[in-house]
Amino acid sequence: MTRKKTNPFVAHHLLAKIEKVNRKEEKETIVTWSRASSILPTMVGHTIAIHNGKEHIPIYITNPMVGRKLGEFVPTRHFTSYENARKDTKSRR
């Protein structure tokens, strides 16, 4: 028996907001906390502000993004380089 393919997850409130904006035919930023939602073809052309844990970062949705998750495009961590640590060890010598 083969496995059944499941439908992509999209939060209901996000889908409702997108349909509402599509009916208005106006461009406005949609704010969401749902990073786990998949990107559907109906979202193409919209700007969605995705929460990264601290603030909402606006992302413009294009065709190559369809099928991926919203959270993939907004990093949650900020990498601080190790250069400062290396400079300190050189000055101690």
Curated annotation (Swiss-Prot):
One of its GO terms (biological process) is ribosomal small subunit assembly. Keywords: Chloroplast, Plastid, Ribonucleoprotein, Ribosomal protein, RNA-binding, rRNA-binding. Pfam families: Ribosomal_S19. Its main location: plastid. GO terms for molecular function: rRNA binding; structural constituent of ribosome. GO terms for cellular component: chloroplast; mitochondrial small ribosomal subunit. The keyword Chloroplast applies. PROSITE patterns: RIBOSOMAL_S19. It is found in: Plastid, Chloroplast. HAMAP family: Ribosomal_uS19. Protein S19 forms a complex with S13 that binds strongly to the 16S ribosomal RNA. Belongs to the universal ribosomal protein uS19 family. This is Small ribosomal subunit protein uS19c.
